């Protein structure tokens, strides 16, 4: 075997191994209610209700839950007159609850009619979502699209032009397919569909600008349900324009499949600097928690280093050295405790969302990983001494023993948060120094 000298030559110095995303794709900033989207603003998390919008109380309850979970914009379906009539009442009730999250109206087929006949709805919404595939058909398309854009201009509202391959503009797709068939070098039909997605969004945006809607009032999206197609479409959309971009994998699915697919697609695009606002479109279990899509979106952004929302708890996966479940239970309990307390902590302890906690299960990686965290514990693995060293700011602080290790560590975490983020000395003072 050939020896390889991996040491840097003194005269050259050590070569830096770069980490981090590419620079953000530069887009025109759009204001949606009280939220800035694009133009270098933090990537915005949004979500969508699944209630009947005409059911005012149920919709208010779910919007409030999504907002409190961290959704910074919430989209609601406006599909009929009863829903349009309910929108201003939903806005009013949310305001009384102190929930100022911007509401986005999701319109299909008859959006022009609902917005014109219910001006209070048009005024209460912060943004209108238009689907260029079903805003109108044949000779009615331009008229109905123009009507929505003019209402947006009148009310000083933003618009998302959201193409979706499940409802793609069939006239555009047919024309592109026919042009491709006549080409001496035809491309794959799926590639034509991707091109149609990009053109649908961009041609609609161009038309909106011609009507008078400026770029700083437009956000574009082009959603598909296949990860590779989604990546390709958004890369092209970003390459051809500087409109603010809404990312999302449509019909991602249920459970782990939906989470993994969305994380893979959005993670790649975000790493390439593409995306100004994201939504994770999960299919919830019957009666499931709708706020899961918000938590997943936040975790994607936080694990990639784009934003911080809640303190992170790092925990090892466990192996044959960790037959005890103590570290798993402690990691779960600490994360649950943090999530429960975060609404109050955000105001009481500014910056606490940047806290890193480690709960490790044995001596192999436990001490090292705990040192990387702000506060960490290395619990004993199988056959190891029943003692758990705690590390604070990279230094061994003390060793916990006995049946109360979990409770003692939780108390240390609370003390650390209070003193680091509450203005007191950074090191816990209610416990003794390292033993």
Curated annotation (Swiss-Prot):
Residues 1-24 are annotated as: Disordered. It comes from Afipia carboxidovorans (strain ATCC 49405 / DSM 1227 / KCTC 32145 / OM5). Belongs to the IspG family. [4Fe-4S] cluster binds at residues 316, 319, 362, 369. Converts 2C-methyl-D-erythritol 2,4-cyclodiphosphate (ME-2,4cPP) into 1-hydroxy-2-methyl-2-(E)-butenyl 4-diphosphate. Keywords: 4Fe-4S, Iron, Iron-sulfur, Isoprene biosynthesis, Metal-binding, Oxidoreductase. Pathway: Isoprenoid biosynthesis; isopentenyl diphosphate biosynthesis via DXP pathway; isopentenyl diphosphate from 1-deoxy-D-xylulose 5-phosphate: step 5/6. InterPro entries: Dihydropteroate_synth-like_sf (IPR011005), IspG_bac (IPR016425), IspG_bac-typ (IPR004588), NO2/SO3_Rdtase_4Fe4S_sf (IPR045854). This is 4-hydroxy-3-methylbut-2-en-1-yl diphosphate synthase (flavodoxin). Binds 1 [4Fe-4S] cluster. It comes from the Bacteria. Gene3D superfamilies: Dihydropteroate synthase-like, Sulfite Reductase Hemoprotein, domain 1. Its cofactor is [4Fe-4S] cluster. It catalyses: (2E)-4-hydroxy-3-methylbut-2-enyl diphosphate + oxidized [flavodoxin] + H2O + 2 H(+) = 2-C-methyl-D-erythritol 2,4-cyclic diphosphate + reduced [flavodoxin]. One of its GO terms (biological process) is terpenoid biosynthetic process. The gene is ispG. Its EC number is 1.17.7.3. One of its GO terms (molecular function) is 4-hydroxy-3-methylbut-2-enyl-diphosphate synthase activity (flavodoxin).
